[in-house]
Amino acid sequence: MQRIAIIDIGSNSARLVISHIYKNGAYNMVYNQKEALRLSQKVDEKNMLTEVAFSSTIETMKSFAYMCKIYQADKTIAVATAAIRNAANGAELVARVAEETGIQLHIISGNTEAYISYLGVINTINVKDGIIFDLGGGSTELILFKNRKILESVSLPIGAVNTTSMFNTRNVMPANVFSDVSFFIISRLEKYPWLKQNGLPLIGVGGTARTVAKIIQREKKYPATKIHNYSYTAQTYCSFFNRLRNTNLEQRKKISGLSSERSDIILAGSSIISCLLEATGAKKLITSGCGLREGLFFDYYSKENHVPIIAKDILKMSRENVLNLYEPDQQHSRHITHLVLSMFDAWGELHGLRKNYRRLLETAALLHDIGITINFYSHARHSAYMILNAKLFGLTHKEQVITAAIAGWHNGVSKNYFKDRFYKELLSDANWKTINKLALLLALAESLDYTETSQIHVIEPGINKKNATLKLYAQGIPSIEMHQIQEHLSWFKKTFGVELKVQLATAAEE
């Protein structure tokens, strides 16, 4: 096992993330620490970081170094962004940090920061074309990508902290000040005509983007607590921002979802997003919980493990990671996945579902047993909970709930259990009918490998004028599997309106 520490010293805050990489290539985060620094506010008239900035940064880095020691980190990757990059004495601070903590900070350029943030987004959000904005305390990185490849990028010295200081918007933002802020930002954005991409979504990275999403979720009483891949319309944003502009600092401190440490810089940060919507013509915003730190991890991981730095299929990548974390023996799960996909493909006339549901079924099948890690008893419920909360990229929030319900329901967990616990507001009655169909297919597939020996190695699902058919090819007589599948025949008839005729192939047919 290898332990990787990633440190990001930004203009507003500093972060330490420690992850484990296991021998089988699986990885997960085991520690996360955030410290507010506000370096963009600790710069004098000569563009020098003050002694207060030095002391607070060094104390934070000492704390990070101590935690790296506690977790026995094998590798530490530490970067500094806009505040230190733009300061006249940034290199001096880097030297002091190295001398007093032993950690070598690397000041990365704006273009490098943009690229690394892009890696964090493109490997975790399933969007082909879009514009990423990484809005920090002292800068905003903008990246245009199409077909998942970068076409343009730029780093602008406009952030939530330095814009707050420049226009004194810590408490309120009167109309005339907002006009000045907007003119200042738009005049800089207009220098990059490639930003005008009507129809492409804006993908937000950074604390301001996450906070805005959290506030909107609370206002809408959104049933999930996930921020990553949460999307909303530009109209929703404008309504939110118009309300926010009419608040003072004390009022904002009472807003659900807005932390007190960000309440003084949210006006400036939100103004930047408002100007980006105007400059790009975007109609939709997507929130990314992954950015610079995740990009640094993917960059390191790809080089060490000789895998593409940009995953071709992010759902498959993340699904395999979850499987490798919790399923040491994968033969059974992979075998029933093969069986259930054969049924889905052959019985399309019966289930009538779009091909998109195939990947949800595949994910549920591969991960249906991971709950055994917690306890064999009620493991279907545990599997469903783990799938619901796992870092499965490439699925919408709704798709992840459906996948979790398929995995749990196939093994007898009641529909009402999920309705009561799993964000029932996200799913319609039609969704539950779909889940029932897919859970049934998964139950059939699992019954065909009940002994987990792959005795039934090939199946031929079919449909004739009267019934659905399922011919089984096996080594020997799979008596236990033949008994188990009988228990699902009434469920099949109730769901699809036809009987399922199961036939074991003869030796001559093998």
Language model regions located:
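Short, non-transmembrane amphipathic alpha-helical segments
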Residues: 480-499
